[in-house]
Amino acid sequence: MRKVTLMDVFTHPIAQKYLQRSGVAHAIACAYHAYRLSVKADINPDLAAKAALLHDIGHYEWYTDGKWDYEKYKRNDIHAIKGAERAHKLLIRLGEEPKAAKEIALAILLHTDSYLPEGELDKNTLQQIVKKADELDEEPGGHHHYRQIDPSTARKKIEKLDQLIDQAQASVIKPV
């Protein structure tokens, strides 16, 4: 039995504040992609879904003359760093196991290479899943962050994903 559910994370005021900024519809879509990918890879779907749900909570909106400046964002982006820290703090506050909170935070930290110097990192499977889940929902110019979802629909999707994770966790899951 999980101590902290996706619904616990999703409904927390801190998560809501940052999910609203980065895009609730995108976060939920990524959580579903991560769930599916993690089940196929025999990786803990709870960790994958939580990391994907929270992967963009470090976003800061870059504007020039009142308009979203995607190029400025790409040049100055550190959202994965801020998001990893925010997610870790939130998960610990909610009672997540420290090791799980760290794994989730690291997956968030490494879901993008926009702030990293050139080169390749050796990412574990969970980290690769969160990156892929984000890529699967991406739209040109960052428009995926602006898709809308009704709050009631969002909650229903999170409830359903929690149920799917509980069912999947009934089987043996290898550690990350």
UniProtKB/Swiss-Prot annotation:
TM region positions: none
GO molecular function, a single term: hydrolase activity
Record key words, sorted: Hydrolase
Pfam families: HD
EC numbers: 3.-.-.-
Residues annotated as domain HD: 23-139
PROSITE patterns, alphabetized: HD
Domain of life, source organism: Bacteria
InterPro entries to which the protein is assigned, alphabetical: HD/PDEase_dom, HD_domain, HDIG_dom
Entries under SMART domains matching the protein: HDc
Listed name of the protein: Putative phosphohydrolase YueE
Species whose genome carries this gene: Bacillus subtilis (strain 168)
